[in-house]
């Protein structure tokens, strides 16, 4: 068969096992972080592969690990608690990795084994379903994906006969000049019948310069045994693009982000500048959301219908309500209510909850705070470890002093409270419903409902202080001249 793979969205089948190869060292990444754990659109590379295996509906998912084992296992176990973990032994090679991987499968498993690489993040479940379907319909022993590349350098070439049938995989180092001109390459995605795979792996040796057990040798073993092999090209080579260095990681991130953005645009989201907008795979946006330039919507953030986010805004695992506006803001693990406004230059730290029609304005930092519906923190304030009721107003420059050097304490502000400018609320303290505080007040004691809390002494003007304390200075001379001069017109008003 020489036609391209038809991605037709075959239904899930529980008779599928997936083996994910995540044992490689990834030296070309030049990183302390294992290659398969490098982040891409909010998930590690291997996380994308695990998610695809889950969507495929595989009955068993096996991850083969070796280098930086503990780090990889921690992440895999968190993302896919039911995944089976198998350690590759000292025998290197992809063939050996699969050989140890299938030992985790039940002895009686007779379905299909799909082999994936942990560094191929864009491959989707629809493509795999179609690959498995083609494998079953043709009753193949092995069906593999291929891709046609403008630059196939470094990849194993697919050799076909005159009739277009698959004949072999030839690695670059073994290819003739004519074979090197072939642009169809092995994509490293395979479907085996379980029993055929078990028999084949036992026949693969390590008679090569690297003394490795190569999975690609399985094709030769099956062919010599008279088995059926089919190689199906994918229409979209990005689906099988592997990540080996940071250049490829950036290219994959750009491509995946473009696909994510296009999907949301087709779903009714306005994105003004896709080049400067980044959206993670787990983020969710409703129709009629507007995303302005320079915006990142990360993690499991959700943005409800009619909301506007940006410009220059970062949301991490943050919920934005309907018709809310969030501009030039950094928010993490926050909840922003419907029709609320945030920004510009606001910093919403974890635990911030802003009620419907509330406001967090310019140069405001919040943390672990619940702000009720219609309440406002308009500007230049720090509000931490606090509860603010509904329809209250926090004056400019307010500081909620929540830390005594040892422990954090909470501040409670009731409904319809008006805090004066430059207040310091020293927690723990309560400001009662309907109360006011004077400008510049340092509130250390509870303010009863309906009261006015003040802590600033009455103003006293010390006439002549500048001349007495700073004689001969320009300020003193100017003060004397002003005192001796004509009265200010404003004083007669």
UniProtKB/Swiss-Prot annotation:
Per the UniProt entry, what species is this protein from, by scientific name?
A: Clavibacter sepedonicus (Clavibacter michiganensis subsp. sepedonicus)
Q: Where is this region: Linker?
A: 247-267
Tell me the keywords, alphabetical order.
Acyltransferase, Cell shape, Cell wall biogenesis/degradation, Cytoplasm, Magnesium, Metal-binding, Multifunctional enzyme, Nucleotidyltransferase, Peptidoglycan synthesis, Repeat, Transferase
| Reaction(s) the record says it catalyses | alpha-D-glucosamine 1-phosphate + acetyl-CoA = N-acetyl-alpha-D-glucosamine 1-phosphate + CoA + H(+); N-acetyl-alpha-D-glucosamine 1-phosphate + UTP + H(+) = UDP-N-acetyl-alpha-D-glucosamine + diphosphate
NCBIfam families noted in UniProt: glmU (TIGR01173), PRK14352.1 (NF010932)
Q: Where is this region: N-acetyltransferase?
A: 268-493
Which Gene3D superfamilies does the annotation name?
Hexapeptide repeat proteins (2.160.10.10), Spore Coat Polysaccharide Biosynthesis Protein SpsA, Chain A (3.90.550.10)
Q: Provide a GO biological process annotation.
A: cell morphogenesis
Q: Which SUPFAM superfamilies match?
A: Nucleotide-diphospho-sugar transferases, Trimeric LpxA-like enzymes
Encoding gene per record: glmU
Q: Where is this region: Pyrophosphorylase?
A: 1-246
The active site of this protein is located at 379
This molecule's function is given as:
Catalyzes the last two sequential reactions in the de novo biosynthetic pathway for UDP-N-acetylglucosamine (UDP-GlcNAc). The C-terminal domain catalyzes the transfer of acetyl group from acetyl coenzyme A to glucosamine-1-phosphate (GlcN-1-P) to produce N-acetylglucosamine-1-phosphate (GlcNAc-1-P), which is converted into UDP-GlcNAc by the transfer of uridine 5-monophosphate (from uridine 5-triphosphate), a reaction catalyzed by the N-terminal domain.
Q: What is its EC number?
A: 2.7.7.23, 2.3.1.157
Residues that coordinate or bind acetyl-CoA: 396, 402-403, 421, 439
The entry marks the following residues as binding Mg(2+), namely 119, 244
Q: What is this protein called?
A: Bifunctional protein GlmU
Under Gene Ontology molecular function, one entry of this record is: magnesium ion binding
Subunit details for this protein? Homotrimer.
Cell inner membrane is among the record's keywords: no
Q: Which domain of life is it from?
A: Bacteria
**Cofactor(s) required for function per UniProt:** Mg(2+)
Region annotation Disordered: where it falls in the sequence: 470-493
Location relative to the cell:
Cytoplasm
Among its keywords, does the record have Zinc? Answer: no
Q: Which family does it belong to?
A: In the N-terminal section; belongs to the N-acetylglucosamine-1-phosphate uridyltransferase family. In the C-terminal section; belongs to the transferase hexapeptide repeat family.
* GO CC annotation: cytoplasm; membrane
């Amino acid at each position: 068969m020489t036609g391209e793979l038809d991605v037709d969205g075959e239904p899930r089948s529980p008779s599928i096992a997936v083996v994910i190869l995540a044992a490689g060292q990834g030296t070309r990444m030049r990183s302390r972080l294992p290659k398969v754990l490098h982040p891409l659109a909010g998930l590690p590379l291997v996380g994308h592969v695990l998610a695809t295996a889950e969507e495929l509906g595989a009955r068993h998912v096996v991850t083969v690990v070796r280098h930086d084992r503990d780090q990889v296992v921690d992440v895999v176990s968190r993302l896919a608690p039911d995944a089976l973990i198998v350690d590759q032994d000292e025998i290197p090679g992809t063939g050996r990795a699969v050989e140890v991987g299938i030992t985790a499968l039940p002895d009686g498993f007779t379905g299909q084994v799909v082999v994936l690489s942990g560094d191929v993040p864009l491959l989707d479940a629809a493509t795999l379903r179609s690959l498995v379907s083609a494998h079953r319909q043709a009753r193949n022993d092995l069906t593999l994906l291929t891709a046609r590349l403008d630059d196939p350098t470094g990849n194993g070439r697919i050799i076909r006969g005159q009739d277009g049938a698959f004949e072999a995989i030839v690695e670059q180092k073994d290819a003739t000049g004519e074979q090197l001109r072939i642009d169809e390459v092995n994509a490293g995605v395979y479907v085996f019948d379980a029993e055929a795979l078990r028999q084949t792996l036992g026949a693969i040796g390590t008679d090569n310069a690297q003394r490795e057990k190569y999975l690609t040798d399985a094709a030769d073993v099956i062919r010599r045994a008279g088995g059926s092999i089919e190689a199906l090209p994918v229409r979209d080579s990005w689906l099988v693009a592997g990540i080996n260095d940071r250049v490829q990681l950036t290219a994959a991130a750009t491509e995946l982000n473009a696909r994510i953005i296009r999907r949301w645009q087709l779903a009714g989201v306005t994105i003004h500048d896709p080049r400067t907008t980044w959206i993670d795979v787990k983020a969710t946006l409703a129709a009629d959301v507007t995303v302005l330039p320079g915006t990142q919507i990360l993690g499991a953030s959700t943005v409800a219908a009619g909301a506007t986010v940006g410009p220059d805004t970062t949301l991490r695992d943050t919920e934005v309500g309907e018709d809310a506006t969030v501009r030039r803001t950094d928010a993490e693990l926050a909840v922003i209510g419907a029709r609320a406004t945030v920004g510009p230059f606001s910093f919403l730290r974890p635990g911030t909850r802003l009620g419907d029609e509330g406001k967090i304005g310019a140069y405001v930092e919040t943390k672990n705070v619940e702000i009720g519906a219609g309440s406002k923190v308009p500007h230049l304030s720090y509000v931490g470890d606090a509860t603010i009721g509904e329809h209250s107003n926090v004056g400019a420059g307010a500081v909620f002093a929540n830390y005594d050097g040892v422990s954090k304490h909470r501040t409670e502000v009731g409904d319809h409270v008006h805090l004066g400018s430059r207040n310091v609320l020293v927690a723990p303290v309560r400001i009662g419903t309907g109360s006011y505080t004077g400008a510049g007040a340092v509130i250390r004691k509870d303010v009863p409902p309906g009261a006015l809390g003040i802590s600033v002494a009455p103003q006293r003007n010390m006439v002549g202080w500048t001349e007495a304390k700073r004689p001969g200075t320009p300020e003193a001379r100017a003060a004397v001249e002003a005192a001796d001069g004509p009265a200010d017109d404003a004083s007669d008003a």
